[in-house]
């Protein structure tokens, strides 16, 4: 983009603060009229140094740190981190604790998708969509808050279990919220399908093929919108997902419309998963019996070794590689977030399109800049 420009070309910098972005980053565009001729993404505006911070905190303190990788999906960040430590300790949470984790992580998936849908509607001029989704999201956050004591950054999971059991009356308060959300999802689809402008701004726009997605390491709804049925909850089940009945939602078009549809369908599956968990959850302890692990686990030394653990984040594959040297804090934690590979697909997708379509394409990826700049 640094070569000489033709007389009808110009460089435009979008960001680092721009209403259509999911967080601070700069998108440098080379334009000829309204057509994008070249594009590059510039990151690093909110780098937090989380991987280095984890090396200087005890394992228990690290739970609070990984919440900040992306506060929207703090529970799946915790699941990935805690899962690594549990592998090193060679322990498994009791069945009740596993069901509680799944319930909360699926509630987290619902609120994340609701926010993503609302923001996308706002990006493409469908402002009322944000008002609808944010209202439903509040109900989900209230349920999460009821269990964890926080709407975001929960610090709820513990090695071998969860901090607290489900409160009394949780099931009775959850079922009406889920039933209402089922109807609301149908309403969203009717709004989308009946809106000509929405269809024109999404169908056939920003098409990503399955081969392109796999070559870039894209995962999550963006990958499944290309027809690839890969979901870690199915392909490499963790917790009690292997005992639950749910579908991997896919579309084949690979465009903005398909990406939104995958998320809508995934919300239905998350509701179904939560309903199964509420019916199947057994009584019992929330920590392994006969072990020192509990709500206030003392400073502990984790056996030396190295592990990799990955989970299905609302945006794709969240993985962590952890190395222990036998001390009370990790020697190294390498985080593999879902949005960084997805962001690599943005420049090639928007080259040759218009600025207006660029906003639609970028928004359909449902990004989290905080996770990229960890």
UniProtKB/Swiss-Prot annotation:
It comes from Methanosarcina mazei (strain ATCC BAA-159 / DSM 3647 / Goe1 / Go1 / JCM 11833 / OCM 88). It is a peripheral membrane protein. Optimum temperature is 39 degrees Celsius. One of its GO terms (cellular component) is plasma membrane. Component of the F(420)H(2) dehydrogenase (FPO complex) which is part of the energy-conserving F(420)H(2):heterodisulfide oxidoreductase system. The membrane-bound electron transfer system of the complex plays an important role in the metabolism of methylotrophic methanogens when the organisms grow on methanol or methylamines. Catalyzes the oxidation of methanophenazine to dihydromethanophenazine. It shuttles electrons from F(420)H(2), via FAD and iron-sulfur (Fe-S) centers, to methanophenazine (an electron carrier in the membrane). This is F(420)H(2) dehydrogenase subunit D. Keywords: Cell inner membrane, Cell membrane, Electron transport, Membrane, Methanogenesis, Methanol utilization, Oxidoreductase, Transport. It comes from the Archaea. The FPO complex is composed of at least 13 different subunits. The keyword Ribosomal protein does not apply. It is found in: Cell inner membrane.
